[in-house]
């Protein structure tokens, strides 16, 4: 068994994307490879077949390996619920909420979970492709590190260091990161990868030669800037749009301070007939055909944010003029009459008034609901699949008019009697082509084009593997993976 780790000089350097690319590149060669991220901090997550929760990036990487997501692929997941605290998820299950200081003391326990998962994967897969987190050179986070070099040292694996040249200062990033590592950690770095380059590679070559001479380490390759690559963002909100046709549906989403699983909106962002706008604090709220309240890791706090930024008034006006309103997960809970958090799971214990648009109330409970589901939208009997990640239990008369009839016999969500408002606990429902088309028609779009989001994701994964094949040193990569040269 061989473990190869990808670390980055910064956040968003391209670690997740490179691991996805390497996983598919190796899989195409018949190599049995599995993705792994020791510790992930993100509000975008996925549900595994065994009812656990992992980072969404690892679910995409699993797809690149043609594997079902498993909790061992991301044994530690941190989901921030305040500026200083986060829910700690170990092996797919929420175990506690901690502030940063408390978690620092918890890292030894977390490392045990990380090494346990790595050991289990090593028993079934000859190659483990690991993604680091942030930068390995964060001096204040070096003690008891489990996400980067601390893990690499523990399992004795080689490391590739990737940097984003599009940000500028790529050579300073690479050399500076290397020099901030200990001698043993520096020895683990077996090469550099430069990401998102655009221009004439000949103009970059003198810099590459200098880098290799300065560090004694090879440049494994230079990956080009790809304009229209659309894989789910691990954490940051992706607001890029595809080209639109003349007839579009205007969809508006508030950017909540604790927005979660905003990858729900990627299929809409890529749809040629949808103009998707994310509205941040202080921005004017534009007219829309459809307003969607997204998921939230701190629903009561984010509901206060909506009120403070004029959204409650804007929603009332929107509905008065015939617009459609949708809530997903935390957004569904906001649509009801009351939100109760008696245990203080998402902040201070207490209750808040909801928007009062659907006759229902929610109580937050300790046990989180985690499951992948299939069913049919009651709108058009359209097939839908998605996943539930929520701690709330919602009850009330509004649920009698469900939004989704699930295959397991349960009903999900609610619709208003006038058909203007719809809420659901299901994340990922826009990824189902039939359900997406049905919801867009409900919101007022005529002659809806069907878009297969899963096919688009698969196409992009294949494109990534092609880039590895063309631009990186395959012989060195195979050697680092413990494989013979082809």
Curated annotation (Swiss-Prot):
Domain of life: Bacteria
Function: Catalyzes amidations at positions B, D, E, and G on adenosylcobyrinic A,C-diamide. NH(2) groups are provided by glutamine, and one molecule of ATP is hydrogenolyzed for each amidation.
Keyword Cell membrane: no
Biological processes, Gene Ontology terms: cobalamin biosynthetic process
Protein name: Cobyric acid synthase
Disulphide-bonded residues: none
Active site residues according to the UniProt entry: 329, 427
Alphabetically ordered keywords of this record: Cobalamin biosynthesis, Glutamine amidotransferase
NCBIfam families with a match to the protein in the record: cobQ (TIGR00313), PRK00784.1 (NF001989)
Domain GATase cobBQ-type: 248-435
Family under the similarity heading: Belongs to the CobB/CobQ family. CobQ subfamily.
This protein's pathway: Cofactor biosynthesis; adenosylcobalamin biosynthesis
Gene designation per UniProt: cobQ
